[in-house]
């Protein structure tokens, strides 16, 4: 112990050799006790100015900001469906049953533009489904082709329904009375032939002059189309009924 009268020496900084080094395994124990302590500094968000420079960390890896929840509908989209002149009156009469599925089920905004003869659909902030606009367009188009509202609503509820359209001239070239007789064979007396094809194939058929529209599943449309083509080519309705019964029985056995 120095004498009380001795000069006091200034405290010198410890040399590098005197600094105690961490014992091997100490870091491991610290990490086990405090998980995530190593990345504490790396997780600190630093305000970044708007620049094109990529932010990287000490190891050269790019650093990205945390992901944010973004509304699935990023922008407003609009569809305009033209309405044929002969379907404007049915559209006005059935409008009260057409717009509720579009607004309540698909969460779309819709309006009927009488001046331009179109139905306008628009997505909104409440729209959650990405394909809602396309479904709404298919629903309105099905009505413009001549399908009932109840049948067209099935396009909104089921994903595996389609509409296939073709003309009589695509099957066989006909003019005048021969074409009228072909349409009569497809419809039948009081529409019995058409109803029989619809019930057997589980489809819906619309006869619009020389155009034929079929709504249903892929295999069901194929069955109904084969029956309609056979009638156009002149096959007797009795044979068509027989083929329908056979194929319908096979379809029931499958399911």
Swiss-Prot record:
Gene Ontology molecular functions: RNA binding
CDD domains, A to Z: KH-I_PNO1_rpt1, KH-I_PNO1_rpt2
One biological process term in Gene Ontology: ribosome biogenesis
Subcellular location: Cytoplasm; Nucleus, Nucleolus
Keyword RNA-binding set for record: yes
SMART domains per UniProt: KH
Main location: cytoplasm
Keyword terms: Cytoplasm, Nucleus, Ribosome biogenesis, RNA-binding
InterPro entries, per the entry: KH-I_PNO1_first, KH_dom, KH_dom_type_1_sf, KH_PNO1_2nd
Domain KH: 179-228
UniProt keyword Nucleus present: yes
Any Pfam family hit: KH_PNO1_2nd
Domain of life, per lineage: Eukaryota
GO terms under cellular component: cytoplasm; nucleolus
Function: Required for small ribosomal subunit (SSU) synthesis. Has a role in the processing of early nucleolar and late cytoplasmic pre-RNA species.
Record note on quaternary structure: Component of the small ribosomal subunit, ribosomal RNA processing complex (SSU RRP complex).
Stated family: Belongs to the PNO1 family.
Protein name: Pre-rRNA-processing protein PNO1
Native species: Gibberella zeae (strain ATCC MYA-4620 / CBS 123657 / FGSC 9075 / NRRL 31084 / PH-1) (Wheat head blight fungus)
Gene label: PNO1
């Amino acid at each position: 112990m120095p004498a009380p009268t001795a000069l006091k020496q200034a405290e010198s900084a410890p040399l590098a050799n005197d600094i105690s080094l961490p014992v091997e395994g100490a870091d491991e124990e610290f990490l086990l006790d405090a998980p995530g302590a190593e990345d504490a500094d790396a997780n600190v968000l630093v305000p970044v100015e708007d620049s094109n420079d990529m932010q990287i960390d000490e190891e050269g890896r790019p650093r990205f900001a945390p992901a944010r929840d973004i509304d699935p509908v990023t922008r407003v989209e609009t569809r305009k469906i033209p309405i044929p002149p002969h379907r404007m009156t049915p559209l006005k009469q059935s409008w009260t049953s057409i717009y509720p599925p579009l607004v309540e089920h698909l969460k779309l905004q819709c309006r009927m533009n009488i001046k331009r003869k179109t139905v306008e659909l628009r997505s909104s902030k409440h729209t959650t489904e990405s394909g809602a606009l396309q479904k709404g367009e298919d629903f309105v188009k099905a009505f413009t082709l001549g399908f009932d509202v109840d049948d067209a609503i099935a396009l909104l509820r089921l994903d595996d329904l389609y509409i296939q359209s073709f003309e009589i001239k695509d099957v066989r070239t006909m003019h005048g009375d021969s074409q009228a007789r072909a349409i009569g064979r497809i419809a039948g007396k009081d529409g019995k032939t058409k109803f029989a094809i619809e019930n057997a194939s589980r489809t819906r058929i619309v006869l619009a002059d020389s155009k034929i529209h079929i709504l249903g599943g892929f295999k069901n449309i194929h069955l109904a189309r084969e029956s309609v083509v056979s009638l156009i080519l002149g096959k007797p309705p009795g044979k068509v009924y027989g083929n329908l019964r056979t194929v319908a029985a096979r379809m029931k056995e499958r399911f």
